[in-house]
Amino acid sequence: LSQSKGGNESTHLPAWDDLYEQTGAACPYNNSHFLNRLEDVYRCINRSAVIKGSNGPLGVPAFEVRTPLSGHKVTTAPFGFYPTILGDQDHRRALDYLTDLAAGLGRRAYVEYKVIGALPEACLARHNINVTTPTLAHVLPLEDSYKVLKRGFAKRHRESLQTIDKRVRKDGVEIVATRVETDVRAWFRLLVRLYRDKHLMVTQPWPLFRRLCMDEDMSPLAELMIARKQGHVVAGVVVLKGRHEWVYAWSAQDPVAEKDGLVKYILDQSLQKAISFGAKRFSFGLTPPSHKGLRDFKMKWGCHEEPVYHLYWNARPKNVDLQMSARRLRMAYRFVPLWLAERLPSFIVPRLA
């Protein structure tokens, strides 16, 4: 993480961590500890920097990634994560910084810039930007009390949570936060199986979860909450925590326990915890346009929808629907043995970027 003046005038610019702390609305993906973990796990180069914006310091997330499939690029959202620009929301100067970086890497290097909401046409034209069809980000504004927040849930969703709560108490299901390796590994196996059998894709690699969910210095940022039944991990949710915003990052449950609704229950517990910590937003992540079931699930919590645009400089847009693209081909992934599916992400994901 570095500083850059971003203009001809010399100015004192804060460090990335200082700007992150000053920015009340910052997403936990912008936390330098998280960004550094991405650099470690995926062997990419973190070029994020604080530059001079038109109205103050501007933090631009940027990663230099070189892959066999994607080529050489500078991206603000590597490997499916979406840090935002910090401080001054000057997208023109952010794009100036990113395109200058890419231009210095060779004529075929390109920029991938992901942003919530549409940018002005003048900004797009200045950089000759290509834009993809937007995906949807789902964000739940948090109230000062869980009781008030719950009123915004769909009625049947509230009733379902009450039923699950009674079942959890009756069955003696234990809901705990954990950083124990055996728990984290057990949950990771559930996640790999879910992605293999239902989503037909690889998940993020084990080294990322080991660092996020087990390293003690990451405990203020990342938390795995699990459901343990009769001594076995049967469900779990990973949330990333920021001062202003929490992010629902991953979840998985044992298919046998799916009817118990434990992911939904743990997510509800996480919402209550976020409110108690003073968070103002809870992000439910991105939703492919074709995934109606996932969108409906998020809307039951009272989420608001925000369009996320993928902008490209020196490259054609890549309209990829994670739900439907190459689905017939991906069906074969179901036949991969679980032990192999656990190891494949470490080899595949860094090459997809």
Indicate residue ranges for each PLM-predicted region.
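Conserved acyl-donor/pantetheine-binding loop and adjacent beta-alpha core of acyl/acetyltransferases
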Residues: 65-82
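Short loop/turn motifs at secondary-structure junctions
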Residues: 45, 107-109, 278
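A conserved beta-strand-loop-helix scaffold within acyl/acetyltransferase catalytic domains
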Residues: 3-54, 58-70, 116-137, 143-259
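Active-site/acyl-donor-binding loops of N-acyltransferases
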Residues: 60, 65-67, 122-149, 279-353
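A gly/proline- and charged-residue-enriched helix-loop-helix capping module
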Residues: 77-118
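Short catalytic-loop micro-motif centered on adjacent basic/acidic residues
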Residues: 110-112, 176, 281-285
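Aromatic (often tryptophan-rich) hydrophobic motifs at membrane interfaces
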Residues: 50, 57, 80, 95-103, ...
